[in-house]
Curated annotation (Swiss-Prot):
Organism: Neisseria meningitidis serogroup A / serotype 4A (strain DSM 15465 / Z2491)
Function as written in the Swiss-Prot or TrEMBL entry: Catalyzes the condensation of iminoaspartate with dihydroxyacetone phosphate to form quinolinate.
InterPro entries in the record: NadA (IPR003473), NadA_sf (IPR036094), Quinolinate_synth_A_type1 (IPR023513)
Protein name: Quinolinate synthase
Source taxonomy: Bacteria, Pseudomonadati, Pseudomonadota, Betaproteobacteria, Neisseriales
Binding site for iminosuccinate: 62, 83, 154-156, 171, 241-243, 258
Signal peptide start-end: none
Co-factor binding details: Binds 1 [4Fe-4S] cluster per subunit.
Length: 370
């Protein structure tokens, strides 16, 4: 690990008012989907399977959505994955319609990469605190103050913010891309997640200015409470998503994207894991490693009303009923201005090309910003 060349948090930036707690959102957000009973769920799944075939559609789901939706995606030849895997799958699949079960920026990313396809979502109001906390006008004004810096944005942003960037990254490839840019002597603006940005800054030593956004789920993890839980389970491996605060990351055995955490849970020989990310990932972890124990990392503290509230209220808006509605009505479609989509595709495609290069081992062969 390297010492960061420059710690950020030293610039003027407008205070963006976003919800501060996943608990608060769940308590106030009436549209969080109810879990259907078994009979209703089975009926909806059968109807959706038929609709997917009739409409030449495929279901692409994130690890954080309802397990019923995750299982349905796999049963119908779709995809369950992290943001990078979802983007790859949608771009490569032959289906004319993509049903994206996740949050809005994921649907937008699918439309950016596949403008010729119809992209539907179970609920267009499924937002993301990182996206909401990084409005395009304010972020662009900040970037304009530092014209000498390369702009790197997390995938959890709007199409308009992506269009302002030089690079888009997911947590799966953020470290590698920033390391590459640092090797070229580039100074960076990073947005919007301050915890992920600070982690990358510490790991790479890159010169980064950080936007001050955060994920309302990962921001709730508490280092003190995690340390206490770790003391209760000294044999447990601690898996942490890098959107978590530094005090939590410092207690981790593995830091990484949802896919990396899932791989560690399955491949490592240990039998007990403490997991600091959205609880939705536990479904796939338990499926792939049924002989292992998974413990949710604590979010209690600062008045928290539950020991672990780590699930995204907007991801919870995705439902089987919403998928059926989108397929039968043709509504809940992601629509983007053509020029905006083209501008946003450049940095997003740059990431996908870089990620493909990682697999080939030739990531340094001319894949810098155009």
């Amino acid at each position: 690990m390297q010492t960061a060349a420059r710690r950020s948090f030293d610039y003027d930036m407008p205070l963006i008012q976003t919800p501060t707690s996943a608990c608060q959102i769940r308590q106030a957000w009436a549209k969080v989907a109810d879990t259907p009973d078994r009979e209703t769920a089975d009926r909806l799944k059968d109807e959706i399977k038929a609709l997917l075939k009739e409409t030449n559609a495929v279901l692409v789901a994130h690890y954080y959505v309802d397990p019923l939706i995750q299982d349905l995606a796999l049963e119908t030849g779709g995809c369950v994955g992290d943001s990078l895997e979802m983007a790859r799958f949608g771009a490569e699949h032959e289906a004319g319609t993509l049903v994206v079960a996740g949050v809005r920026f994921m649907g937008e990313s699918a439309k950016i990469l596949c403008p010729e396809k119809t992209v539907l979502m179970p609920d267009l109001e499924a937002e993301c605190s990182l996206d909401l906390g990084c409005p395009e006008e304010a972020f662009s004004a900040f970037c304009d103050q530092h014209p000498d810096r390369t702009v790197v944005v997390y995938a959890n942003t709007s199409a308009a913010v992506k269009a302002r960037a030089d690079w888009v990254v997911t947590s799966s490839v953020a470290l590698e891309i920033v390391s590459y840019l640092k090797s070229r002597g580039e100074k960076l603006i990073w947005g919007p997640d301050r915890h992920l940005g600070d982690y990358i800054c510490r790991e790479t030593g890159a010169d980064m200015l950080l936007w001050q956004g955060s994920c309302i789920v990962h921001n709730e993890f508490k280092g003190q409470e995690l340390a206490a839980l770790k003391a209760e389970h000294p044999d447990a491996v601690v898996l942490v998503h890098p959107e978590s605060p530094q005090s939590v990351i410092e207690l981790s055995d593995v830091v990484g994207s949802t896919s990396k955490l899932l791989k560690a849970a399955v491949s490592r020989p240990e039998k007990k894991f403490i997991v600091a990310t959205d609880l939705g990932i536990l479904h796939e972890m338990q499926k792939q490693a049924p002989d292992k124990q998974f413990i949710a990392a604590p979010t209690a503290g600062n008045g928290g009303s539950c020991k672990s509230c780590a699930f995204c209220p907007w991801m919870a808006m995705n439902s089987l009923g919403g998928i059926k509605y989108a397929l039968t009505s043709g509504r809940n479609e992601i629509l983007l201005d053509r020029k905006l989509g083209e501008a946003a595709k450049l940095p997003l495609q740059r990431m996908l090309d870089f990620a493909a290069g990682l697999k080939r081992g030739d990531v340094f062969n001319g894949m810098g910003p155009a």
